Amino acid sequence: MTIKLINIGFGNIVSANRIISIVSPESAPIKRIMQEARDRNMLIDATYGRRTRAVIVTDSDHVILSAVQPETVAQRLHTKEDGVEDA
């Protein structure tokens, strides 16, 4: 099993194999997930103080906040799965 890494913005890298979902932070259930993760010390803020645009949920119950759009993260994940490198 190879480890696939994906850039989630500002030089932050996440293991693509561990990602369960990539969602927008706007809905109340996602905000609740973010708050619960913060309370459990399982929240990773990778936004560098910028607005949260994507919430990444991993199989280890970590919740990662990213400042890039969910579509961008998903596209990077898709290109990594196809074996095509980012330009």
Swiss-Prot record:
Organism superkingdom: Bacteria
Family label: Belongs to the RemA family.
Alphabetical list of HAMAP family matching this protein: RemA
Protein name as annotated: Putative regulatory protein ABC2323
